[in-house]
Amino acid sequence: MLRRWNIVIESLRRVHSSDLENLISASLYNRTLCTASESLNHGVVDESYVLAELSSLLPISSNKTSVSKEDSSSKNQVAIDSFLSAEDKLRGVFLQKLKGKSAIQKSLSSLGIGLSIDIVADVLNRGNLSGEAMVTFFDWAVREPGVTKDVGSYSVILRALGRRKLFSFMMDVLKGMVCEGVNPDLECLTIAMDSFVRVHYVRRAIELFEESESFGVKCSTESFNALLRCLCERSHVSAAKSVFNAKKGNIPFDSCSYNIMISGWSKLGEVEEMEKVLKEMVESGFGPDCLSYSHLIEGLGRTGRINDSVEIFDNIKHKGNVPDANVYNAMICNFISARDFDESMRYYRRMLDEECEPNLETYSKLVSGLIKGRKVSDALEIFEEMLSRGVLPTTGLVTSFLKPLCSYGPPHAAMVIYQKSRKAGCRISESAYKLLLKRLSRFGKCGMLLNVWDEMQESGYPSDVEVYEYIVDGLCIIGHLENAVLVMEEAMRKGFCPNRFVYSRLSSKLMASNKTELAYKLFLKIKKARATENARSFWRSNGWHF
């Protein structure tokens, strides 16, 4: 023991104190310490031997280090989790590949997330969970507070499974509802049938209807109408006709059954088939109503028989019926399709004179038709009337108005619709904001561009690389090159790399303005950002998501 201490002390004495750290780390020295051994036993004592003696004589406790590592890792985990939404955290549990449902449910419960049916719907509808994972998550969710085990909750999982064509899991959930004490209703049956029809599994949808009583859903006129509606809305009208004829006499039909068949043939423009169904409807003791006439008028319009549709419209009053909004909408749609905008406006004014209140479909067809026909002033006038009557457009409808307006002409009309919709309380979609930014950028309207950008961020939409490119382009057009560089640097700080065309345009303008130093600094930053982007693309192509 004394000899080992002497070797270590003699070695440390002959090494300069500044070189001690390098000696212990063994990273800078490959030569051995021979001086100590010459005076003691004339042997060779290498560096590894000295380090081994030090480690045995001076042990260092690793408890403190491990604790600090655990603390830092927990802090990092908290920092990472702060960037994740509740839906991503819940989906992330299934990425861990835990074995057993109990382990998965325990991990889900440990997250401590307050569940709601909206969060459950987001987890199921987004991402790429397997069918088994979706069912496992739903079984856990309905046992948690905040999510009730009722028909509404089960309709969410049925719709999510049907949308992804996971039909075996969908049928298991539908059959298991009764065992869980929840009786399926017509909505659940409709979701399942529509899921089959959507992927052209018509026979399975019909078989599901015939087996509906085994699920607790009565085979009635309402369920039969739901089957017909699923088939006709997906253009399987011939199959609907076969089922309609097969069930005639077994299931009592009502006027809705006949109207669904008429609407199906109307979408295909089959006037003769519509007339046959209308004749059967009258023979069965059901008089055609305004909905029947509206489908008939639409079908005639699709075949170009506008004059016949006008004749039917004029005969409605003679038969004791008063045209409603559906009938007027069909006439307006026919004339818009024929690009006869004056006649469509005449029927709209006639509708108001007859004190028939226009609905959202009326204004949707009018405004969209006038915009596509480039009757922008008339479209803006109708849009203002729409808002003045308290009819608010949906988010998707506002986007459909803005899309054609942002494809031709200056952005004035698009900005009018955007500002009035926003003022009325309508929510603007992210795609609508991008359409506006792109159009304003092209025309160099940077004041409006920056205002819309601020309003987009106020609405909760994050700025992606596409948005930054529009801003940089707009600033380049009006010559605000320094501001364009600042925006591009902000984009790179957020991990985005603008495309080569945007950078090339900005760099060329900087060089033309004798701002060589600024252009060179931007080049270095773009070079680094592009390398990072290429690395990220390589990671993702190999399945490494960081």
UniProtKB/Swiss-Prot annotation:
What's in the keyword line of the UniProt record? Answer: Repeat
PPR repeat ranges per the UniProt record = 150-184, 185-219, 220-250, 254-288, 289-323, 324-358, 359-393, 394-428, 429-463, 464-498, 499-533
Pfam families the UniProt entry points to = PPR, PPR_2
At the top level, the lineage of the source is Eukaryota
Name the PROSITE patterns on file. Answer: PPR
Transmembrane stretches in the record are: none
Give the record's family classification: Belongs to the PPR family. P subfamily.
Question: PANTHER family of this UniProt entry?
Answer: MITOCHONDRIAL GROUP I INTRON SPLICING FACTOR CCM1-RELATED, PENTATRICOPEPTIDE REPEAT-CONTAINING PROTEIN PET309, MITOCHONDRIAL
Output this protein's name.
Answer: Putative pentatricopeptide repeat-containing protein At5g43820
Origin organism of this chain?
Arabidopsis thaliana
What taxonomic lineage is listed for the species of origin? Eukaryota, Viridiplantae, Streptophyta, Embryophyta, Tracheophyta
